Amino acid sequence: MENNKEIIHESEVKELIIELRGEKVLIDRDVAKLYGVETKRINEAVKNNRDKFPNGYMFSLQVSEKQQLVENFDRFSSLKHSPVEPKAFTEKGLYMLATILRSPRATATTFAIIESFFKLSLIHIS
């Protein structure tokens, strides 16, 4: 996904969605990967727009949650000894993030994220 013009498919998003605290979320590093930016850019966007991310939009992982990620998902192994507290974005938080990140890649990624969460909600309802 290094090419900023690459189209993001719903299947790519779906396989990154995890459940924490009873909510389907994407972890900041996965969000960054989808948007084709560094994780620190996602976190800077949040920090610079804190008022757009109230409770329920995103949260920092507790140590035990971070440990759970490392143990259950190979893609998070680099977090094992990292002092960084990863952030989890809920569906609402991802929509808000989309209003901040502006680029053709961000627009395409947002469409894929919206479709993925919508389809997951349909599965949950059935």
In which residue ranges do the predicted regions lie?
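Conserved small/polar residues in nucleotide/adenosyl-binding loops
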Residues: I123-I125
